[in-house]
Amino acid sequence: MTRVYNFSAGPAVLPEEVLQQAKDELRDWHGSGMSVMEMSHRGKEFIAIAEKAEADLRELLGIPADYKVLFLQGGASAQFAMVPMNLLRGKKSADYVNTGEWSKKAIKEAKKFAGVNVAATAEATNFSTVPPQQEWKLDPGAAYVHYTPNETIGGVEFSFVPETGGVPLVVDMSSTILSRPTDVSKFGVIYAGAQKNIGPAGLTIVIVREELMGQALPGTPSMFDYKVHADAASMYNTPPTYAWYVAGLVFEWLKNKGGLKSMAEINQRKSAKLYAFIDSSGGFYKNPVEKHSRSWMNVPFTLKDAALDEPFLKGAKGAGLIQLKGHRSVGGMRASIYNAMPESGIDALIAYMRDFMSKNG
């Protein structure tokens, strides 16, 4: 069977090397006679897997010692609630920046727990750009500032880390984590669903500064309290062990690729190549995002005539290029090109797009 190029926004493509290692170890992990899926999460075998995964993630991101790394469940959607439940700490409001669909979801959930000050929004530009920070209206008394550095649906990405004047900065890094170097010390909380750049669905990584834990809202369920999970080394309940294991393999793969600086160079090159082709197509293909706000990870584009969408997708599938249909809320196409998408996948996509244009232009 020939592998396809999978441009899914998530669950997304995994590195070939990781899939092969997982296959090789599936029935017998390191001579244990067990699959990782069968291991007790409190047994020494899985503890070794868990500890190495955390150590490798800390090394890749340069996570300071005063931050806890939590391996949780529930995706970013659960974090939309966990963030205000844990970080309000006696305050009544928080600042949010609205740059698209995932920002909106976070804002909607936060309103159940606190007053939300939308400090900036990209609605006026139909979410085609990131509002410059000089236009933001931050509240110095806010409990925290929340933003989404990359909107996977709209393909809008921040090119800067916001300055918050000492107010804790919270970031939904689900689609950009590990795609480039990150100064973790600038953030109070980083959270990320795993199914884009980390591993399989079912795992959520949360990186939280220790001083921000331990003041959850009264009545917060134990499963939603960061400190409960930190004190239990992410094993307050049975964690998603296999997803944690595969994430660890991805961390090893990233280290072997040269780390996040090397990954950033590859990702920038991949996205630049695809945008350059779209921009040179004479309007046959269009990307709606302002150039300075274009995403490295998610490239949405439309064809000159929506009637060509279905033939385009059918032909792409025949060429081994799948999951290119845009999100239902915006239509068109979307190529998600996370870390594990090889550059050859971009080349194959461009070749197909060029051929389709020549036949339908």
Predicted segments, located by residue:
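Active-site phosphate-binding strand-loop segment of PLP-dependent enzymes
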Residues: 10, 110, 121-177
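Conserved PLP-binding catalytic core of the aspartate aminotransferase-like
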Residues: 285-316
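Conserved N-terminal alpha-helix of the aminotransferase class I/II PLP-enzyme fold
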Residues: 33-79, 86, 101, 109
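A glycine-/small-polar-enriched, mobile loop at the entrance of the PLP active site in fold-type I
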Residues: 3-54
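Active-site C-terminal subdomain of aminotransferase-like
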Residues: 15, 194-275, 290, 359-361
